[in-house]
Amino acid sequence: MGLVSDIHGNRVALEAVLADMPPVDELCCAGDVVGYNPWPGECVDELRARDVPTVMGNHDAAVVGETPFRFNGMAKAGIDHADRRLSEAQLEWLAGLPTERRECDGRVKLVHGHPDDPDRYTRYTYPEEFSPRLLGDEDVLVLGHTHKQGARQFAAGIVVNPGSVGQPRDGDPRAGYAVLDLDAMTVDTHRVEYDIDAVQAAVEDAGLPKRIGTRLARGQ
C-alpha cells in the first residue's frame, strides 16, 4: 500500500512521487490535497482518477468551509487560490471526504492530525511523539498534518506519517511518501527529488506569496 499526505496543490511533486513509487495494490492519502501551491485542481483530479481513499485535511476543510482552524496569511492565500481554481465537481469531492476512514478490512486507519481530534485539526502528532497509545483496534495508523516524515513499529502495530508530498518541513526538501506491507507488517519511508524551481516560478505566476516557493528549497 502506498501512503501519501499533505500534497498541498504541488502537482510537480505529486507526479515525481507517483513515478518513483514501486507497484502497490492501493494508494491512500492522509489529507490536505490542496492549499499553498498552484495546482489544487490537478491534484484533486489525480486522486479522483485513481480512486484514492482520502481523508479531509484542515486546508481541504477550509476550502469547503468546514473547519474552525485558524490560518496565517500565507496559508489563507493558498486556500483562497484553491477556492477560485476548483470546479464545482472538485469542490464536491473535497466536501465529501471523511475525517477518518478504514481500509483493508479495518486494519489501516487514516486521519489527518490526531485520532482523538480528527475533525478540528488542533492537535499535531510529531514522529517523536508516536506511541502505542495512539493505536486503537487498527494494525496501522496513518496520519499527516505535521509535514514531518516518520514511522514507528510497536507490538500493537505501526504509526506512520508518510511525510509531505508538496511542502516538507523536516529539513529535507524532497517529496515524501511511504510504502506499507501489511502481510509483513513493515513500512518503508521514501524521498524523491522534484523540480522545485518550476514550482517556485509557478507560485509567482499565480500571484501567490513568494515565500510559499522559497521555503520549498529549504524543506521548511
Q: Can you say where each PLM-predicted feature lies in the sequence?
A:
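Conserved hydrophobic/aromatic beta-strand scaffold that supports enzyme active sites
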Residues: 100, 110, 177-179
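Active-site environment of divalent metal-dependent phosphoester hydrolases
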Residues: 8-13, 35-38, 59-65, 102, ...
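Active-site-proximal beta-strand elements of phosphoester/diester hydrolases
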Residues: 1-8, 107-114, 159-163
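Active-site-proximal segments of metal-dependent phosphoesterases and phosphodiesterases across multiple
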Residues: 69-79, 108-136
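Short hydrophobic-aromatic micro-motifs
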Residues: 54-55, 108-111, 141-143, 158-161, ...
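Anionic-ligand binding region
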Residues: 122-150, 155-160
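Acidic, His/Gly-rich catalytic cores of divalent-metal-dependent hydrolytic chemistry
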Residues: 152-220
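Core catalytic region of metal-dependent phosphoesterases/phosphodiesterases
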Residues: 2-95
